[in-house]
C-alpha cells in the first residue's frame, strides 16, 4: 500500500532537488526559445492524475481493454474540442508528440521510397520534413525547398518547379524557424497540379491559428498536424486534424494505432482536453495577439540596433537573428545570453557557413514571455539587453555587461513570476 504521507523530497531527494532547481530556473530565467511555453496549473494537475494508470489501446468505444468508460469520455471531449477549436472534421488526439503525429501521416499517405517535398531544415523546416538524419529522409525520397536568397521568403516558384520535376506523393508545408505567414492556398494549388497530398505541420503556430491571428490550413490541407505545447500552451504531445475524408481518416487512425503506437497516454489526453477548452476563451485570443505584437516589437528593436532578421521581420511569434559576418557564432551568443539568464537557442540561418552545432544565428520567440505578462515596455528593454550582450562579445567587455544584464533580468523576473514560489 502506498504511504500517503510520503513526499518525493522524503523518498527521492535527488530527483526532488532537480525538480526544485528547474522550478527556480524557470522563475529566474527569461525563456525565449520559440518552441517553449508555460502550461497552466490545471493541465499539470491532469497530467499528474490517476488517469496515468489506465491502459486504453484502441479508440473510444473500440478498446482492447475493459474499464475504459471514463477515459473514453476524456478522449471524446479532447476530440470534440480539438475539432471545434480548429474547425476540423476529424481529430486524432493520441500521438505522443508532433514528430509521431507526422510519422503517422507519412505512414498513412505514403509508402517507403515515395517522394516527399518539404522545407529544408537549414532554411527553417523541421527534422520530419525530409532531413536526411530523420526517418522522413531515410525511408522516403525527400526533396527539399528553401527560401529565396534575396528576399528571405518562401519561394513558391521554386516549390512549384520542384513539384513538377519530382512529382511528389506528398508536399509538406510548415516550419520550425520561419517568421512570416505561409500561403496555404498556394501550397494547395501546387499539390493539386501534380496530384500530391498536402500535409501541413502547424506545430509552431497552432495557438495563433486557434485564436484567429494566423491563417488556418485545416480546411485547405488534406491533413494538418500540430504539437499541443508551443504556442498552443497545452501539455507536451501531438494531434492530427483533417477535413472530411473517410478513407484518409481510416488510414490515419490505423497509422497511429496499431501502426505506430500502443496505449495512449490518457493523463496527457486529459491535459490536451483542458488546454483546448482554455484556448476557446477570449482571454486566450487576446494572449495570442499579444504574442505576435511582442514579437514584432522585438524584431523592430533588433533591427533598430543594427541586427539583421531573416525575412526582414516577423508576422508570427518567432524570428531568426542572422549573425553571419559577426566575430562570434550562434553558439557563443547562446552561451553569453544564457549566462545572463536569458534562454535562447542557436540556430542555423540560410546559407550558414558554420556547422549545425555552431551556427550563425539565434532563434527567439515570445510565447513564454507573453504568458509571463511581458508587454511592449518589457520587450523593448529585454531586446536592448540582449543587443548589449551580443555587442559586448565583439567589444571585449562581455563579463561586466553580462553581470549587469543578469541583475536586470532577475529584477524583472521577480516582478513577473510564472507560477510563484514552489
Swiss-Prot record:
InterPro entries the UniProt entry points to: PyrdxlP-dep_Trfase, PyrdxlP-dep_Trfase_major, PyrdxlP-dep_Trfase_small, Ser_HO-MeTrfase, Ser_HO-MeTrfase-like, Ser_HO-MeTrfase_PLP_BS, SHMT-like_dom
Residues where N6-(pyridoxal phosphate)lysine is found: 230
Pfam family, one: SHMT
Keyword field: Amino-acid biosynthesis, Cytoplasm, One-carbon metabolism, Pyridoxal phosphate, Transferase
Positions of transmembrane segments: none
Enzyme Commission number(s) from the entry: 2.1.2.1
Residues carrying the site annotation Plays an important role in substrate specificity: 229
Cofactor: pyridoxal 5'-phosphate
Any one GO MF annotation of this record: glycine hydroxymethyltransferase activity
Domain of life from the UniProt record: Bacteria
Residues the entry annotates as binding (6S)-5,6,7,8-tetrahydrofolate: 121, 125-127, 355-357
Reactions performed catalytically: (6R)-5,10-methylene-5,6,7,8-tetrahydrofolate + glycine + H2O = (6S)-5,6,7,8-tetrahydrofolate + L-serine
Pathway: One-carbon metabolism; tetrahydrofolate interconversion; Amino-acid biosynthesis; glycine biosynthesis; glycine from L-serine: step 1/1
Group of enzyme by EC: transferase
GO cellular component entries: cytosol
A GO biological-process term: glycine biosynthetic process from serine
Subcellular location: Cytoplasm
SUBUNIT field: Homodimer.
Function: Catalyzes the reversible interconversion of serine and glycine with tetrahydrofolate (THF) serving as the one-carbon carrier. This reaction serves as the major source of one-carbon groups required for the biosynthesis of purines, thymidylate, methionine, and other important biomolecules. Also exhibits THF-independent aldolase activity toward beta-hydroxyamino acids, producing glycine and aldehydes, via a retro-aldol mechanism.
Protein family per UniProt: Belongs to the SHMT family.
Protein name as annotated: Serine hydroxymethyltransferase
